[in-house]
């Protein structure tokens, strides 16, 4: 029996008690779901709930009296061995060994789908992250949201949501002209222009542009600039996509800002916002009255010279997401974009949406890497490509995903490269590799999964391991709900530690000369269930699950 199954049974007991008149409480006081938690002291049972304390006041009863009503119904559930009332009214539930152990077989049968849930079924969500300017290589500032954003999207999908991962390409505006001018200057052997982009990567782009378009060297600057800008942009965007792919980060859509301008979407967005009654004219410019919706100041949409602002493109982009059917739009932004929260929520409100429901802005803090070398190729930055070559995608993805994104993070490369238990990614991956080693040893010894007797899994380390495996779907659901992949990483570390202790205490393969029993076969199921949970969790974090280490 999984914690979720027990939760369903407990919820049914509560509703039955209310329907039978044993508990008289207002309808709104009855929770849709009664959750169970692992007690800190295992002497207090396998699972515990404080539902009796929650319902005592609306029921007008002592918490222990509420607990007594639920206790009698819980004891009748198949698989529940005992129910005890502790303290002011906590319900401590002990499962019989067969009910607890059956989980191992269920996990193996579920395979890669174990941990998936329907908590967000029906939600259509757009997750936008990274969205770095296509004027240079990805660097350290982009790494955290690349890792976290991809994992958030995976978690949302695992919880039943329909999710689109999106990268907004800032390919419009003066920065693109400066970028193109920088590459053109490199082609001509001239210094970087004022406001341009330095670095060896510009020279590399210049060489590639000349290889692909040799005729540009014969054009005037005016004629060459648009050709060079377009070619260099495509080459740099291809480099960004390749780096993201090597980092294990997937995007469904790369959305061009320039397309908003070329298709007239920006002008149409201004007209739509005008129709909502929030546009006004001042000093020859067109403004959006965002202060009506908690923004700190009103924002210019169209300058007095007729040029749209970047904010106008932001508004058009939001409306594009809305028109494409995304009910919830999640933006993952760096700490330097904190001021965007108010203006983005104001856009949503001006568009007739509910900022509390239709838009969510997550702010991440900066990451530093001790000992990281600045890129000579890209100037005064640490390139993501260099970090991948140095630390590897797995170590980088896991270390970025295991800490809350809203806290500053300093990575220690020396620790991430250690093959020891104080390296979290090694610790978890090694646990998975160990489950595969047990599989190989079991096969060599003739132990298979031809029998399964859940009631044999009675060792304390087995009940502990089963409890952690059973908690995995709830951890996934909570991580998706709060957009916090680190919850999965930290749980995997608990699973790994619990598994290692079980491995030390319980043998799957018998000693030489000993008979193979159903206990050996059943423990193989538990071993494989653990490997499946570790693999599924690592996949949610974008990290590989090696079979050998």
UniProtKB/Swiss-Prot annotation:
UniProt xrefs under Pfam families: Arg_tRNA_synt_N, DALR_1, tRNA-synt_1d
InterPro entries to which the protein is assigned, alphabetical: Arg-tRNA-ligase, Arg-tRNA-synth_N, Arg-tRNA-synth_N_sf, ArgRS_core, DALR_anticod-bd, Rossmann-like_a/b/a_fold, tRNAsynth_Ia_anticodon-bd
Subcellular location: Cytoplasm
UniProt keyword Cytoplasm present: yes
A single GO cellular-component term on record: cytoplasm
Catalytic activity, EC: 6.1.1.19
Reactions this protein catalyses: tRNA(Arg) + L-arginine + ATP = L-arginyl-tRNA(Arg) + AMP + diphosphate
Keyword annotations from UniProtKB, A to Z: Aminoacyl-tRNA synthetase, ATP-binding, Cytoplasm, Ligase, Nucleotide-binding, Protein biosynthesis
Primary localization: cytoplasm
GO BP term (any one): arginyl-tRNA aminoacylation
Ranges spanned by the short sequence motif 'HIGH' region, renumbered to the chain: 132-142
UniProt GO MF annotations: arginine-tRNA ligase activity; ATP binding
UniProt record similarity statement: Belongs to the class-I aminoacyl-tRNA synthetase family.
Complexes and interactors: Monomer.
NCBIfam families: argS (TIGR00456)
Name this polypeptide is given: Arginine--tRNA ligase
Protein's organism: Renibacterium salmoninarum (strain ATCC 33209 / DSM 20767 / JCM 11484 / NBRC 15589 / NCIMB 2235)
């Amino acid at each position: 029996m999984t914690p979720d199954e027990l939760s369903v049974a407990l919820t049914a007991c509560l509703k039955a008690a209310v329907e039978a008149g044993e508990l008289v409480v207002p309808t709104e006081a009855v929770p849709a779901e009664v959750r169970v938690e692992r007690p800190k002291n295992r002497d207090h049972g396998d699972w515990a709930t404080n539902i009796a304390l929650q319902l005592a006041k609306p029921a007008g009863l002592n918490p222990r009296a509420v607990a007594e009503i639920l206790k009698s119904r819980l004891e009748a559930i198949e698989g529940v061995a005992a129910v005890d009332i502790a303290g002011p009214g906590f319900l401590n539930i002990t499962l019989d060994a067969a009910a607890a152990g059956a989980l191992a077989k269920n996990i193996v049968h579920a395979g890669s789908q174990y941990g998936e849930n329907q908590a967000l079924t029906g939600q259509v969500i757009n997750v936008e992250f990274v969205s770095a300017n296509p004027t240079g290589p990805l660097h350290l500032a982009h790494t955290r949201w690349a890792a976290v954003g991809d994992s958030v999207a995976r978690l949302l999908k695992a919880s039943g949501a329909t999710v689109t991962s999106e990268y907004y390409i800032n390919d419009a505006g003066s920065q693109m002209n400066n970028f193109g001018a920088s590459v053109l200057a490199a082609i001509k052997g001239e210094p970087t222009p004022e406001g341009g982009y330095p670095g060896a990567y510009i020279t590399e782009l210049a060489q590639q542009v000349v290889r692909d378009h040799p005729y540009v060297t014969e054009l005037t600057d005016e004629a060459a600039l648009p050709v060079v800008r377009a070619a260099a942009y495509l080459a740099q965007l291809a480099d960004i996509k390749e780096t993201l792919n090597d980092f294990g980060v997937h995007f469904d859509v790369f959305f061009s800002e320039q397309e908003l301008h070329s298709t007239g979407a920006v002008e149409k967005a201004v007209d739509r916002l005008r129709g909502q009654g929030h546009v006004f004219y001042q000093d020859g410019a067109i403004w959006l009255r965002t202060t009506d919706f908690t923004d700190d100041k009103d924002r210019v949409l169209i300058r007095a010279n007729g040029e749209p602002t970047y904010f106008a493109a932001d508004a058009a982009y939001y409306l594009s997401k809305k028109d494409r059917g995304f009910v919830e739009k999640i933006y993952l932004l760096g700490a330097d974009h904190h001021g965007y929260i108010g203006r983005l929520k104001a856009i949503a409100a001006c568009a007739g949406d509910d900022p509390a429901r239709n838009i969510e802005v997550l702010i991440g803090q900066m990451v530093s890497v001790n000992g990281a070398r600045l890129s000579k190729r890209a100037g005064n930055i640490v390139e993501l490509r260099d970090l991948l070559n140095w630390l590897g995608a797995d170590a980088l993805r896991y270390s970025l995903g295991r800490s809350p994104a809203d806290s500053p993070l300093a990575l220690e490369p020396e620790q991430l490269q250690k093959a020891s238990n104080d390296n979290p990614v090694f610790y978890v991956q090694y646990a998975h590799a160990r489950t595969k080693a047990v599989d190989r040893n079991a096969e060599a010894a003739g132990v298979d999964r031809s029998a399964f007797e859940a009631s044999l899994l009675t060792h304390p380390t087995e009940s502990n391991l089963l409890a952690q495996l059973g908690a995995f779907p709830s951890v996934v659901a909570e991580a998706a709900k709060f957009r916090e992949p680190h919850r999965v990483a930290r749980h995997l570390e608990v699973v790994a530690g619990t598994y290692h202790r079980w491995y030390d205490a319980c043998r799957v393969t018998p000693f030489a000369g000993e008979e193979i029993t159903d206990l050996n076969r059943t423990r193989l199921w538990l071993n494989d269930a653990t490997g499946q949970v570790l693999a599924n969790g690592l996949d949610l974090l974008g990290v590989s699950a090696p079979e050998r280490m």
